[in-house]
Amino acid sequence: MDRMASSMKQVSNPLPKVLSRRGVGAGMEAAERESFERTQTVSVNKAINTQEVAVKEKHARTCILGTHHEKGAQTFWSVVNRLPLSSNAMLCWKFCHVFHKLLRDGHPNVLKDSLRYKNELSDMSRMWGHLSEGYGQLCSIYLKLLRTRMEYHTKNPRFPGNLQMSDRQLDEAGESDVNNFFQLTVEMFDYLECELNLFQTVFNSLDMSRSVSVTTAGQCRLAPLIQVILDCSHLYDYTVKLLFKLHSCLPADTLQGHRDRFMEQFTKLKDLFQRSSNLQYFKRLIQIPQLPENPPNFLRASALSEHISPVVVIPAEVSSPDSEPVLEKDDLMDMDASQQTLFDNKFDDVFGSSLSSDPFNFNNQNGVNKDEKDHLIERLYREISGLTGQLDNMKIESQRAMLQLKGRVSELEAELAEQQHLGRQAMDDCEFLRTELDELKRQREDTEKAQRSLTEIERKAQANEQRYSKLKEKYSELVQNHADLLRKNAEVTKQVSVARQAQVDLEREKKELADSFARTQEQQDVLENLKHELATSRQELQVLHSNLETSAQSEAKWLTQIAELEKEQGSLATVAAQREEELSALRDQLESTQIKLAGAQESMCQQVKDQRKTLLAGIRKAAEREIQEALSQLEEPTLISCAGSTDHLLSKVSSVSSCLEQLEKNGSQYLACPEDISELLHSITLLAHLTGDTIIQGSATSLRAPPEPADSLTEACRQYGRETLAYLSSLEEEGTMENADVTALRNCLSRVKTLGEELLPRGLDIKQEELGDLVDKEMAATSAAIEAATTRIEEILSKSRAGDTGVKLEVNERILGSCTSLMQAIKVLVVASKDLQKEIVESGRGTASPKEFYAKNSRWTEGLISASKAVGWGATIMVDAADLVVQGKGKFEELMVCSREIAASTAQLVAASKVKANKGSLNLTQLQQASRGVNQATAAVVASTISGKSQIEETDSMDFSSMTLTQIKRQEMDSQVRVLELENDLQKERQKLGELRKKHYELAGVAEGWEEGTEASPSTVQEAIPDKE
């Protein structure tokens, strides 16, 4: 973004100098007014836009100059009122930034012209305050600050927009009335509070954990804070001075509230200045002052001399090139306009007004034979053009350098004035310290005199005591005098202590004065350096003047050479006339050649047109023959041995639909441009080939379908072939080609597609485009189900340890541990299956995407989906069964059956994954090892369940010691009956299980994706079930 330019400088304001260069009067003509308004409108719209970047300084400066130009802000508000500030937070934020700049650096009448919109700004602030995100809250606080600023400057018109005032002007603003100073301090506190709120809100809205100041979004929010920093530095300085003035007039208790509020704002401002100085964005744009470590002590009047006004410095060298005023460049171009026009007129007088109308331009007359004079003229012309450009550039650069040096001189003068001001302030402080030093010396002399008089009095008292010891009255008088002298001695001693403390303070102030003198000396050294730089700049300016004079001499030399060339021009006129006669003869010859060429082109075009018709007719007849052959094969008995695929038929239909769209497009292109016939011929040939394949594939597919759908499909293919022949016949002539319509062909294709989709197996209900995503989702769901099962087993084990003891706890730990091992083995199996599937897809898809591979092999894909669902479902059911067994509510047999069912599901997943895998694949070997691990884990679950069941039954064995022989015989018979019933039920359940498995594999044979020759039978999956089953 653009950097802040010198219009915001705190030390000096260059706007009056810019305005003096412009010299625009108050009364503008209509054309000038229209141009001014157009320029201002463009600048305002460029400065206030919806892009999240900082406002460009050159646009903001143009707006500021416009206010000084028209002595107000009417044009600015007329443009802003057309912007949707209430509906776009970014526009409102940038408007606040630009308006803040105008209030600071614009014409004083900007405030008067803006007061009428104060209520609108308040309403807009309340509206944006309802938004807590984005720029809404920032806009609300910024608008509140601008309204407070307008009210403050309205109440205190003595304060300029940039808040730069001297101490005398600050005293005049309060009119030497303590009540006015008190109220002015309160208003400054409110003003500074609004500035700090905006400062804090902007920082809170930024993510300070990263380099936010180097992003355009961060710079957009940070850019207005430069104006805030300038305002805060002045407000803080004036607040300190006013508080010292109030403390000199009012009691300290009365100003306690002022001191508390100042302490709060001092802490905030110091923290914000510290944080701002660390940002990279501010380091290259502004030098932020640092506040003292401790706040001023207003209870000590001498602390005012320790206060240093914070000065914000904006380096001039950070101004970007695009921030230079456009007006200066225009003025620079106007300075050389007359000289350039004079040179162009002279050049036109010598060589003519333009190259195209020059009768002596030999390049157009004869581009082959050039004599030495022609080359000389061209070379001199190029050299003159180059030197002219160099001269113009040198003039522009010299003028730009002069303007830059003038600006640098102005900046150095401003810095010199500031240094002089600081020097005068240091001299005033020095004079104040000298006065205090003289006062302390006088007090010290008085103290020494009192001490000498005290010594004399004591001596006299001792003499009187010896002389008049016998006189009691005189003695009493002397005692009284002695007591008085003692009191005086105490007072003098106290004065001596005060004098000593003052002497210590004097020494400290002397040291501070010496430091102040040292700083002043350093500032004088800096001033000398600046003067040296100024002298160097002036020397460079003199060198540029000398270079300019040298360039003028070179220009005179070239004008002399041009005059000599002008003399040679007359001698070349004769040669030009001869060349003109030769050119006329060549033109006649060219006309006769063009006539012959036109006749040859017409005959060639006719031959090409006839060849295109012949080629189109031949391709069309060949296509008709191919389709007729396909139609004749519908009744051929040779197709009985062929087995078609519905998937293949649907893919052929899709290809034909795409070919029809391309054929329509190519036909339109051929009608628009008959020369481009290659694409049309290719589309006709491709349509005939695909149509024949579709008809033959439809007939072959109907052989495996039921009779009624087969007849419908055959008739639909036959009708499609007839419609295709009719369409090809309409392509015979260009007149009939325009009326050719493929709607009937599309209807026939839709009929074939509908019949084909009805013949698809029930397992293909899912869209083929979604199969790839569904495989990934099901595998992820299986992994998640296994993880959830493992977590739940751990929770069940924790509950069992907390509530069970003895044999039951041992059995539960063994069973749940084996279940956890089984879950881990299944997890390894699922990961190996994913790796193998990825390898299969990568090796088999070619240039197609994975989703297209899954869609192409839909049956195999749905087999994977079914196997994954079965594994996840089995893991959930086994965890439920284990939970019931641990609680004593379930059966051990249910847990064994669930573990075997998981083994069967994993075997199904292995079988589905092995269908398309290479036998030598490393991932296949890992999958088989994982499958064996699952079998072992399943056997461990069954073994731990049987062992636990045995232990539980041993503990629950019946006690027959108290039973009689009859009772034991009775229970024996009951047990035999129960055994027979259970054996009968077992036989029936085994038969039912066999029927269920048979029906399951009949229904899932197609849906589980095993292709022909590799379909898994029930025996195949059964062999993969562990031996323990």
Curated annotation (Swiss-Prot):
Transmembrane parts of this sequence: none
Protein's gene: Hip1
Subunit structure: Homodimer. Binds actin. Binds HTT (via N-terminus). This interaction is restricted to the brain. Binds to IFT57. In normal conditions, it poorly interacts with IFT57, HIP1 being strongly associated with HTT. However, in mutant HTT proteins with a long poly-Gln region, interaction between HTT and HIP1 is inhibited, promoting the interaction between HIP1 and IFT57. Interacts with CLTB (via N-terminus). Interacts (via coiled coil domain) with AR. Interacts with AP2A1, AP2A2, CLTC and HIP1R. Interacts with GRIA1, GRIN2A and GRIN2B.
Signal peptide region: none
Coiled coil stretches, renumbered: 375-636
Record's function text: Plays a role in clathrin-mediated endocytosis and trafficking. Involved in regulating AMPA receptor trafficking in the central nervous system in an NMDA-dependent manner. Regulates presynaptic nerve terminal activity. Enhances androgen receptor (AR)-mediated transcription. May act as a proapoptotic protein that induces cell death by acting through the intrinsic apoptosis pathway. Binds 3-phosphoinositides (via ENTH domain). May act through the ENTH domain to promote cell survival by stabilizing receptor tyrosine kinases following ligand-induced endocytosis.
Family: Belongs to the SLA2 family.
Highest classification ranks of the organism: Eukaryota, Metazoa, Chordata, Craniata, Vertebrata
Keywords: Actin-binding, Activator, Apoptosis, Coiled coil, Cytoplasm, Cytoplasmic vesicle, Differentiation, Endocytosis, Membrane, Neurodegeneration, Nucleus, Phosphoprotein, Transcription, Transcription regulation
Residue ranges, annotated region (Important for actin binding): 859-916
Name of protein: Huntingtin-interacting protein 1
CDD domains xrefs: ANTH_N_HIP1
ENTH domain ranges (all copies): 32-160
